[in-house]
Regions:
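Short, highly charged C-terminal tails/helix-capping segments
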Residues: 131-156
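Beta-strand/loop substructures that line and gate deep hydrophobic ligand-binding cavities in soluble
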Residues: 79-131
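Short, ordered beta-strand-loop transition motifs
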Residues: 5-11, 49-51, 71-73, 92-96
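Intrinsic-disorder/low-complexity, polar/charged segments enriched in Ser/Thr/Lys/Arg/Asp/Glu/Gln
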Residues: 13-15, 54, 64, 99-101
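Hydrophobic/aromatic beta-strand elements that line small-molecule binding cavities or substrate pockets
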Residues: 17-18, 67-71, 86-93
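Hydrophobic ligand-binding cavity/cleft-lining segments
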Residues: 1-44
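Hydrophobic pocket/interface hotspot
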Residues: 27, 37, 55, 69, ...
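Glycine-rich portal/gate segments that line the openings of hydrophobic small-molecule binding cavities
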Residues: 38-84
Length: 156
């Protein structure tokens, strides 16, 4: 499902939703445990899982960016700084698993925004596939499809 993108005050809110047939604690582990995190976003690792702690982003050029965790409610909310923006994962229990909501608060829409949103879109799909025991193939091909859709939505 494509993200819902709206302007709210002085920011843009990109909201992704996934209904997962897995318990919250399992989904939470995919967001916060480095061995699982590496399977869907290998450039990220949790350095210190607490409010004020950090997520480390490997820029793939020998440099690293420290992303400060601004809200942590174990098992339900993880929010951290993403450059000038914010990313937030929320988990809600459902009878057959959980509802994952991912929100990116964007201060502006740039030429890079569709790349970012396509990346998050694919990452969320990959989490779901991995939890369901599916093989992840052609990840970059999927990204290209979503990149085109987000480009059309935001920049045309």
């Amino acid at each position: 499902m494509i993200a819902d993108i709206r302007q709210a005050d002085e920011v843009y809110i990109a909201r992704f939703e996934r209904r997962l047939k897995h318990p919250i604690q399992e989904v939470w582990s995919w967001l916060t445990e480095n061995d699982k995190l590496a399977e869907w976003f290998p450039e990220l690792r949790i350095d210190d899982l607490r409010e004020g702690g950090a997520v480390i982003f490997d820029m793939q050029d020998g440099t690293f960016e420290e992303l400060r965790i601004i809200e942590l409610q174990p098992g339900s909310v993880l929010e951290y700084v993403w450059g000038e923006d914010l990313v937030r994962f929320e988990l809600y229990p459902e009878s057959e698993g959980c509802h994952l909501v991912f929100i990116e608060k964007l201060h502006q829409i740039t030429d890079h925004t569709p790349k970012d949103l396509a990346g998050w879109h694919v990452c969320l799909d990959v989490i779901q596939k991995l939890m369901d025991g599916q093989t992840v193939e052609a990840r970059h091909e999927e990204w290209k499809i979503w990149y085109e859709k987000y480009t059309q939505m935001l920049l045309k």
